[in-house]
Amino acid sequence: MIKYKHKGDVEKVYLEDFLEQYKDKKVKMFVDMDGVIADFNFGEAHNFDKKRPLYSSINKLEDISKKDNVDLYIFSATRMKKGYDEKQYWLDKYAPFFKKENRVIISREEHDFIESATLKADYMRNVERDGSVIVVIDDDPKNLRAIRKSNEDVVLLKDTALVD
């Protein structure tokens, strides 16, 4: 797994070791959908409900969701408002362990089609820190760079963190 420490620095870390390191702290883990738990290239562009589930990642996240100190969130952007309902349906079907109140799905249409990376970085700036370790898992380096730029305290992990 790869962890981004500082601008340009990369460190290999294993997710289980990482979580063990914070077993006595609250962890808020935000997980992207497209390309992380759902195959981004499979199906039609606007029919998210037809995306193929990536079961190895889903199974690992389901195990993580059972840890008492981890709050697991979906953290996804969608181009159009209708994508919100499609993603909710998909989560209900393939990853129902993501609590409905922990599903952050941001519609670009409702935000003047601002780039997903900017929307995600803005959202992360407003996440209540409350002493928790904040983690974002995403497959898009552009999103990770945008989040890092304005959220230096957030731990960024590539989607490969879910594959041992």
Model-derived features with residue positions:
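Structural beta-sheet core signal
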Residues: I74-S76, V136
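Non-catalytic pre-domain segments flanking phosphatase-related domains
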Residues: M1-V31
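Acidic, Mg2+-coordinating phosphoryl-transfer loop and its flanking beta/alpha structural elements
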Residues: M124, D130-D164
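Short catalytic/ligand-binding loop motif for oxyanion handling, primarily in non-cytosolic enzymes
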Residues: A38-F40, L72, K81-D85, I114, ...
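Asp-based phosphoryl-transfer active-site loop
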Residues: K25-G43
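Short, acidic loop-to-helix structural element flanking the phosphoryl-transfer center
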Residues: E44-I74, K81-D85
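Glycine-rich phosphate-binding loop signature in dinucleotide/nucleotide-binding domains
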Residues: D24-K25, D68, V127-V133
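Substrate-recognition "cap/lid" segment bordering the active-site pocket of phosphatases
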Residues: T78-S132
